[in-house]
């Protein structure tokens, strides 16, 4: 390893162990000493706070006016029911919210499979228990599910809503993150004669709405995008060569391939001559859904990937495309 004193080892993905459908262990090595904790902690925080997902945000239960009450014929009180509803693992395709309905009668458990929904909604854990009915009683409720990011307490949404919110519409603390548990461990690694290196092992469990490997990839992409701003600091050290602020965000000038979309989605965009991210963000959802072979699942994937980079569909870009790209389009 002569001559590499000032060079950093470049880590490589060593192994992805799929423990089950919702849990995986990702091993990354070799890392310079100390970088195991640096990268592990950063990825852990992003996975817990920044992964987009879907969650229950509002519930209306027939005969219930507030959460500090109970319903006749139901074993659980309303607070327990709301807590159980937070455990629903749901995905929505092609839109940002959906209304689900539940009606059940007769003694026995009420589970997620009893919920009625349209084809745009998928409930990943249909056996999840919501409550238990006793005797010949019934329960009916309407459940609002929304797409979001991070954790949004009900109190925060209550402050922004109008005072005319109907009595009986119960707000739920929404945890949108599909990552249920994340932990990392740093072990010793060796390359040739060096024994002071790190091996990073990330152990992650999701709620089933996202593949653990995909979650790791998205979190790493988010981290890399955020660090781009620090890379650009080198331009500030050359005041004599100070240039005007670029007309467009550099990310808009990147090819669509950098989004690492599925093959189906990428091919659909290429067929529509959407070559750059700047081309893509100017399209609306309606326009993309008119694209042959591009369905709601692909649309949802595109929206999530753009959201992870602080972008969205339907943006307006004046003077697009720039001269540097005009010849290529």
Swiss-Prot record:
**What's the stated role of this polypeptide?**
DNA-dependent RNA polymerase catalyzes the transcription of DNA into RNA using the four ribonucleoside triphosphates as substrates.
Subunit info? Answer: Homodimer. The RNAP catalytic core consists of 2 alpha, 1 beta, 1 beta' and 1 omega subunit. When a sigma factor is associated with the core the holoenzyme is formed, which can initiate transcription.
| Catalytic activity of the protein | RNA(n) + a ribonucleoside 5'-triphosphate = RNA(n+1) + diphosphate
Q: What is the lineage of its organism?
A: Bacteria, Pseudomonadati, Pseudomonadota, Gammaproteobacteria, Alteromonadales
User: What is the residue range of the signal peptide feature?
Assistant: none
Q: Which GO terms describe its molecular function?
A: DNA binding; DNA-directed RNA polymerase activity; protein dimerization activity
Q: Which GO terms describe its cellular component?
A: cytoplasm; DNA-directed RNA polymerase complex
Gene encoding it?
rpoA
Q: Give GO BP annotations, semicolon-separated.
A: DNA-templated transcription
Coiled coil regions, renumbered to chain? none
Q: Which organism does this record belong to?
A: Shewanella baltica (strain OS155 / ATCC BAA-1091)
This chain's protein is named DNA-directed RNA polymerase subunit alpha
Region called Alpha C-terminal domain (alpha-CTD), residue ranges? 248-329
Keywords, in A-Z order? DNA-directed RNA polymerase, Nucleotidyltransferase, Transcription, Transferase
